Amino acid sequence: MVTGAARGIGRGIAERLVGDGYAVVITDVEGGAVARTAEEIGAVAGLEQDVREAASHQRVAAEALRHGPLRAWFNNAGVGWDGDLGELEEEQVRGLVEINLLGVLWGMRAALASFDQAGGDIVNTASLSGLGPVPGLSVYAATKAAVVSVTMSVAIEAPRGVGVHAVLPDGVATPMVAQMKDTGLAKALVSSGGRLLTVEEIAAAAVELMGSRRVLRTVPAWRGAAMRASAMAPSLASGAMGLFAAQGRRAVRR
């Protein structure tokens, strides 16, 4: 099961799983797009789903179980509207929280209820922004911090044989990043790592978590360490953010 898989990271994860021989069910809020993607990559089903609705996860879980035992559930659906807290519309704030966080929680619950005695893996798409301050992406980062937190907690709660993981990428070359405001602070910070990561890199990192004892995987590792350091002294992080932003703006101009 892969949510948010019509394009971007979700599609990349699904393509890799199909290539590895899995029967893959993919979902997306855009029904036509996910149906086309399913046909193009060889997924067994492409279903329209609004991850904000708890019942939708039970419905797609039932469809997945029609094709065999459930072995992995990837909670990937998400949105990334950028802007300071005071700039975002109320609908955007609500959407960020409901899609990025509630969508993951409902998906995790459905997966846990659907695994058989052989167990399985839950892999959540989080973000490096969930590890420290990211001005210009404050609400998005808050939702991803919550995903990191619940991943670590449920990894302990989960029954034996069930692995719970999250992949935390830096900026990735996806439509989500492309739609960010070119002059905004968020776009600059997301682009400050030297280059945007590829969908294929993150898909590989996510799929490799299946069967692993690792709970969190940051990509790249050095940026994860930098974000954790900024979280330890947020009052001192503004200077570093300025340097990262300047580097990112140069990258965006290129």
Would you name each region that the model predicts?
Residues 20, 132, 153-163:
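Active-site-adjacent segment of SDR/Rossmann-fold oxidoreductases
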Residues 166, 187-227:
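C-terminal helical subdomain
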Residues 84-85, 89-94:
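Substrate-binding pocket helix/loop in short-chain dehydrogenase/reductase
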Residues 127:
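Residue(s) in the substrate-gating loop at a strand-loop-helix junction
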Residues 86, 134-138:
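Active-site loop immediately N-terminal to the catalytic Tyr-X3-Lys motif
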Residues 1-25:
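Canonical Rossmann dinucleotide-binding motif of NAD(H)/NADP(H)-dependent dehydrogenases/reductases
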Residues 108, 143:
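Active-site helix of classical SDR
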